[in-house]
Design a protein with these regions (language model features):
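Polybasic, lysine-rich low-complexity intrinsically disordered segments
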Residues: 5, 20, 33-39
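N-terminal glycine-/serine-/threonine-rich phosphate-binding loop
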Residues: 40-85
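Short beta-strand segments
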Residues: 48-52, 90-91, 138-139, 167-170, ...
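Active-site phosphate/oxyanion-binding loops
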Residues: 50, 99-107, 142-164, 174-215
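Alpha-helix C-terminal capping segments
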Residues: 80-82, 122-131, 184-192
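A charged helix-plus-loop insertion that forms the helical arch/lid used to bind
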Residues: 96-119
């Protein structure tokens, strides 16, 4: 996978065959031309999109940048209207990063992060709905009337109904990131690919925000 920084004007890349300068994410398939990659993406029936919480905040760094989220919704709608089944996993970094807190127990810190992803999914889901898409939010733990409990059968039913399915709450367990969560859900849902929008421009051997020598 190739990671590109999300900002205003990004595009859903090859999935919708739309190209804007500074696209946010895409699938890189080795030894294939751009045309072949785009054709491959168009053949994919079900994809999972992973958005970092920081990506939703835009230049604000915290909370939500509504223009950015609306642009995400616009691009996803292109894919949905083309017949692609889209699932969404969102991080919680625009509200909370448990690994950066030394004051509380790691398990509790990660639980706060899981709840942050639920808030993000509720917000983004409503923006998606404002464009005419139908959505459902699933969590691996009960959240009252706000979400529905995840099951593979339930998610598949929503996909078949043409709904965008939000997978909130990560894996439901501490010590696992939402990047792990999207990989888990992709396997369970038999997705054709994962598309990631991250706040970094590549895959590194250590955190480039901390280690300037990261490779």
């Amino acid at each position: 996978l190739i990671y590109k920084k999300l900002h205003a004007g990004f595009s859903f890349a090859g999935l919708c065959l739309r190209q804007n300068s500074g696209f946010a994410f895409g699938l890189m398939l080795p030894s294939q031309t751009r045309e072949n990659r785009e054709n491959r993406l168009m053949e994919m029936k079900r994809v999972l999109l992973k958005l970092s919480g920081e990506a939703l905040a835009g230049e604000k760094k915290t909370g939500f940048d509504e223009d950015t989220v609306k642009e995400v919704a616009r691009q996803v709608k292109l894919a949905v209207d083309a017949g692609t089944e889209v699932g969404v996993v969102i991080g919680g970094g625009n509200f909370w990063r448990g690994r950066q807190s030394n004051a509380i127990d790691r398990t509790k810190a990660d639980q706060i992060g899981m709840l942050a992803t639920v808030m993000n999914c509720i917000y983004v889901s409503e923006i998606f709905r404002s464009t005419g898409m139908e959505t459902e939010i699933l969590t691996p733990f009960a959240c009252g009337s706000m979400t529905k409990l995840f099951s593979k059968d339930r998610a598949n039913k929503y996909f078949r109904q043409g709904k965008v399915v939000f997978f909130a709450g990560g894996t439901g367990h501490p010590y696992f990131s939402t990047d792990t969560g999207v990989a888990l859900r992709a396997i369970e849902m038999e997705a054709d690919c994962i598309l990631l929008a991250k706040a970094i421009d590549g895959v590194y051997d250590s955190d480039p925000k901390i280690n300037s020598n990261a490779k």
